[in-house]
């Protein structure tokens, strides 16, 4: 009996030791959206009895992060491998659909729907460019200062207010990651260009040869690791704490993405923000827009949301402040965004929204110099031609020097008389006018064969090689399929005065409908009349290979 008890006690002891060993394992979570080199290197050097690896990315499943949350995965260490552009981690491989938006990281960090994923993190390793870059992002401080001055504030006071708002709201990548990985002791990343996967793997190998694997997951920054990656600008920080000066800002940001809040509750919070000074509302504009765009139809129809939206729509003082700020803005894209948002918030009917957009277009025409960005904006706003019916209310400003930009805006609004003048500018010598025409044609491409043939004929008669290249490059984007136009351009090739013009012609043919091309004739023209160049294997060679394939 004593022997059996001893055996049983020994067995229980072994089981307890095994259980404790298993429990003591640190969980290394990996998010691999590009290179697996870094993950594989960590796996190679970290002992299996102390570390277990969990890949969070499920290939072909877009909601893989939410899936990891539902499985109650708890990470001690997180390794993220992917290119980073400030808003998402992504892959360089065209056949890969996996990516990690910063917005989803914010949601996981702020929401109780994913309490475990980041809650016990001790270390984060981000292998992506600029993940911990400390330079602040795009600032609206100058724009806000100008608005405040126009509203009657002194220049000094306006600059003081805009600086304070910028300090609170303008984030660097480093600030954003500290806000996401709240309370995490160590967060590694790169202040500039990160090494590619294979190079990073080699550096990690050298680190593991010189350091104990126990450093990983210790929650303490490794001087050895930072030293190994010093030439690549690796740096380390810690996640935000409750005592951090920006903790209050994090609380407000989380209100936009916290899954525990209903859309009605989030809208009520937005209503509070819209009651603040408009210069601060401006700083929240991106997040308010993102929330409005994310709503499903069922969420919009929910009784609680309808009531919250009705309360906001009837807040006339907030409405007037918002629209006054929009109309006063000297940034047309911002004004357009605010008009669109005012409609979504119930402050503008469909008719009133159209009225505001028409007023914006009229102000651009009357405001003097019109840029290609202004043309792009108006064409985008009238993508569905909803403003065409009110074209008669738009009046071009007499004596405007920039006739082509004004014509482009009018043409975007459906003016049939302005369109030929814009197309005429495409073959002119004024590079700015050509750029305007190019932007216009991105929105209103040539579909009429007669128009295409007329433009192609004028391009063939141009004498300025640089201007001719600009016009030809525009035609290339139209994917020409008209035989007569292509024949005109084929006849131009032998008469071209520069290699650049010939290459631009080749650029049209390489994108053209090959059914409309006499391949043998074109190959003969290319071979016989090609100008000599020191460059090898250019677009003309690529065209020849394709024609002879």
Question: For each predicted feature, which ranges?
Answer:
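Bacterial N-terminal signal peptides
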Residues: 6-17
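A short, glycine/acidic-enriched catalytic loop
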Residues: 84-118, 130-132, 137, 146-148
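Buried hydrophobic core positions in alpha-solenoid tandem helical repeats
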Residues: 322, 357-361, 389-395, 421-425, ...
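Alpha-helix capping and inter-helical loop/turn segments
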Residues: 261, 279, 296-300, 310-318, ...
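A domain-level signal for caspase-like cysteine endopeptidase catalytic cores
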Residues: 21-86, 95-96, 101
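Extracytoplasmic/secreted cell-surface and envelope-processing proteins
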Residues: 38-40, 63-64, 86-92, 133-138, ...
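Active-site-proximal C-terminal subdomain of hydrolase catalytic domains
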Residues: 127-289
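Residue-level detector of extended alpha-helical repeat arrays and alpha-solenoid scaffolds
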Residues: 335, 371-374, 402-406, 433-435, ...
């Amino acid at each position: 009996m004593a022997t059996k008890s001893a055996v049983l006690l020994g067995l229980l002891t072994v089981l307890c030791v095994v259980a404790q060993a298993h429990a003591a394992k640190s969980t290394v979570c990996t998010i691999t959206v590009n290179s697996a080199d870094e993950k594989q290197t960590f796996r190679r050097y970290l002992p299996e009895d102390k570390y277990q690896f969990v890949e969070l990315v499920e290939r072909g499943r877009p909601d893989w992060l939410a899936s990891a949350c539902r499985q109650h995965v708890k990470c001690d260490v997180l390794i993220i491998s992917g290119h980073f552009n400030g808003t998402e981690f992504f892959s360089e491989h065209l056949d890969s659909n996996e990516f990690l938006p910063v917005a989803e990281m914010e949601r996981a960090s702020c929401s109780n729907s994913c309490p475990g994923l980041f809650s016990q993190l001790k270390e984060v390793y981000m292998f992506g460019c600029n993940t911990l870059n400390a330079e602040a992002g795009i600032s609206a401080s100058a724009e806000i200062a100008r608005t405040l001055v126009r509203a009657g504030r002194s220049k000094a006071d306006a600059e003081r207010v805009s600086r304070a708002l910028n300090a609170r709201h303008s984030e660097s990548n480093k600030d954003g990651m500290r806000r996401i990985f709240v309370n995490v002791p160590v967060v590694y990343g790169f202040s500039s260009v990160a090494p590619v996967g294979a190079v990073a793997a080699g550096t990690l190998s050298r680190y593991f040869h010189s350091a104990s694997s126990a450093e990983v997951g210790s929650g303490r920054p490794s001087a050895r690791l930072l030293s190994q990656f010093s030439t690549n600008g690796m740096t380390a920080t810690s996640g935000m704490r409750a005592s951090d000066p920006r903790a209050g800002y994090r609380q407000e940001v989380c209100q936009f993405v916290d899954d525990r809040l209903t859309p009605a509750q989030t809208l009520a919070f937005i209503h509070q923000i819209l009651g603040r000074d408009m210069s601060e509302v401006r700083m929240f504009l991106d997040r308010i827009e993102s929330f409005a765009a994310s709503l499903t139809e069922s969420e919009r129809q929910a009784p609680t949301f309808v009531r919250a939206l009705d309360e906001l729509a009837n807040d006339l003082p907030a409405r007037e402040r918002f629209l006054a700020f929009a109309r006063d803005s000297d940034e047309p894209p911002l004004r357009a965004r605010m008009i669109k948002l005012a409609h979504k918030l119930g402050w503008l009917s469909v008719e009133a929204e159209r009225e505001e957009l028409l007023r914006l277009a009229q102000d651009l025409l009357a405001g003097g110099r019109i840029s290609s960005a202004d043309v792009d904006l108006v064409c985008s706003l009238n993508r569905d031609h909803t403003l065409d019916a009110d074209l008669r209310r738009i009046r071009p400003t007499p004596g405007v020097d920039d006739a082509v930009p004004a014509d482009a805006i009018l043409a975007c609004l459906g003016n049939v008389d302005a369109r030929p003048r814009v197309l005429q500018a495409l073959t002119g010598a004024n590079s700015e006018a050509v750029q305007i025409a190019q932007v216009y044609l991105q929105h209103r491409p040539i579909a009429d064969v007669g128009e295409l043939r007329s433009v192609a004929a004028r391009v063939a008669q141009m004498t300025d090689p640089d201007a001719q290249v600009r016009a030809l490059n525009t035609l290339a984007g139209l994917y020409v399929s008209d035989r007569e136009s292509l024949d005109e351009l084929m006849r131009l090739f032998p008469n071209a005065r520069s290699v650049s013009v010939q290459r631009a012609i080749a650029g049209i043919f390489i994108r053209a409908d090959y059914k409309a091309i006499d391949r043998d004739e074109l190959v003969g023209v290319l071979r016989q009349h090609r100008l000599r160049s020191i460059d090898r294997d250019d677009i003309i060679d690529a065209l020849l290979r394709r024609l002879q394939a």
